[in-house]
Amino acid sequence: MEEVVHYFLEGNMPVAQFREALALHYTNEKELFEQAKRCLNICCGSNNFAKRNDVLFSLLDVAVSISSLELRKELISELYVPVQSLEEAPSEYLVSCCLQLATIYEAEQNFELLCSSLEAVEKHGHFENDLEQLLLLRIRLGDAYLKLGKAEKAILTVRTSIPLAFKVSNDQLLMELQLCNARALDETGQFLEAAKCYYRVLQYKVPGNELIYRENLCSVAQCLLLAIPSPIVLQFLQEISLQPSVREIPFYSLVEKYLKRKFIGKEDGAFLLPFLLPHQVIHMNRLIEDGRHFLETNILFLSEFFEVSSTSILAKHFKLSEEQVDTVVADMVIQERLNASIDQCEGYITFLPEYGKANNLPNYVNKIATVLQHYGS
């Protein structure tokens, strides 16, 4: 095989004949592996860049044909690493090597090396005139970051890619970027933002979206039920209740409880656990242990119906101390998640109007305890 390479580099053999000759000069894959490495050393020393590059591509084709995954991986690595430093190293060749290695690492579930290989593809490639290929690469890289547990890097990759996707006006790519972004935000506990991205995915009219429609609708609902309680979350739940197939969500009974503004508690969190992803289960278990999430949601429910309450009545109903209720309400007001004022001397909480109360129930402090009992049933 080495003689064939020398002969070709000297210009004494056409490319097609050279490639045919390569296939005839080995009897087993191990021998091919060793001969290919020796041929690489020969062509790396050639100053005939055009011929050298032909040899490189031919050797890569030979490497890809090796059936042994381990030998194939090792030979492609051997063909890639030294060529990076060569003068006028062909970018297309380097990209091909990295993509072949990425495929192998993905099959091995070696996500760290998969990410490195895909990063190298972007480094070596020239995508200025092919933004769609760049975006496909970024989507694959974002997915690899998620599998590696680097969700923050996935978010950064996607956010720098979305403006490019708008340039090429490709809804399929935009949808896949939004889905990757949603999963990354979901995994980092940014549940409201994740819900927004999952919801955007539902809006794209692209082939195949109907197949994942219900799954993404479930993801929107899951994230909203895990998000920090706020009027925005409740309004968002109201909006998704208008979506087709919403009643097919396996935990719709809990969504309906929110829609009807029925008090929720730790038992509702426990009910949701079997429908959550592993990282969401961890988060929900924290919410169940703490309990504050459910109290905040119930206070938001009350704020839509009543103008006045008191810390003492709320504390008695929710079996908490007045100090605990006062702290929670104060925090929600400070964080602008509750439009209310607190009279700490008298212990009254005045829920300020936003768009008008949901209905005209009595608004007297001395009647709230009775109403609460009925409301919570």
Swiss-Prot record:
This is COP9 signalosome complex subunit 4. Residues 190-356 form the PCI domain. It comes from the Eukaryota. Belongs to the CSN4 family. One of its GO terms (cellular component) is COP9 signalosome. Keywords: Cytoplasm, Nucleus, Signalosome. PANTHER family: 26S PROTEASOME NON-ATPASE REGULATORY SUBUNIT 12/COP9 SIGNALOSOME COMPLEX SUBUNIT 4, COP9 SIGNALOSOME COMPLEX SUBUNIT 4. Component of the COP9 signalosome (CSN) complex composed of at least csn1, csn2, csn4 and csn5 subunits. The lineage of its organism: Eukaryota, Fungi, Dikarya, Ascomycota, Taphrinomycotina. Its main location: cytoplasm. Pfam families: PCI. It is found in: Cytoplasm; Nucleus. GO terms for biological process: protein deneddylation. PROSITE patterns: PCI (PS50250). Component of the COP9 signalosome (CSN) complex that acts as an regulator of the ubiquitin (Ubl) conjugation pathway by mediating the deneddylation of the cullin subunit of SCF-type E3 ubiquitin-protein ligase complexes. The gene is csn4. The keyword DNA repair does not apply.
